[in-house]
């Protein structure tokens, strides 16, 4: 009996695509410094009455920046978000910047 399809080596088809990616040479990634929490290192507290400090944690549009961008720890990121919202409520920071 003749087979209609050629024989297939099962070992080559079972290998995952990750194995071939791992064996490929790694591309040069830019080295970045680990971001550290300013509040932990300098023993500071976020305060709604200090809009200049809080402006570092919001975008030009007024959105609160995430932890992965600012480098703050989870505890202080929650505090920053709360203080930004308080500062907006008493009109020290704008909700949205107008042009």
Curated annotation (Swiss-Prot):
Residues 1-28 are annotated as: Disordered. Keywords: Ribonucleoprotein, Ribosomal protein, RNA-binding, rRNA-binding. GO terms for biological process: translation. One of its GO terms (molecular function) is structural constituent of ribosome. SUPFAM superfamilies: Ribosomal protein S18. Residues 1-25 have a biased composition (Basic and acidic residues). One of its GO terms (cellular component) is cytosolic small ribosomal subunit. InterPro entries: Ribosomal_bS18 (IPR001648), Ribosomal_bS18_sf (IPR036870). HAMAP family: Ribosomal_bS18 (MF_00270). Binds as a heterodimer with protein bS6 to the central domain of the 16S rRNA, where it helps stabilize the platform of the 30S subunit. Belongs to the bacterial ribosomal protein bS18 family. NCBIfam families: S18. Part of the 30S ribosomal subunit. Forms a tight heterodimer with protein bS6. This is Small ribosomal subunit protein bS18. It comes from Treponema pallidum (strain Nichols). The lineage of its organism: Bacteria, Pseudomonadati, Spirochaetota, Spirochaetia, Spirochaetales. The gene is rpsR.
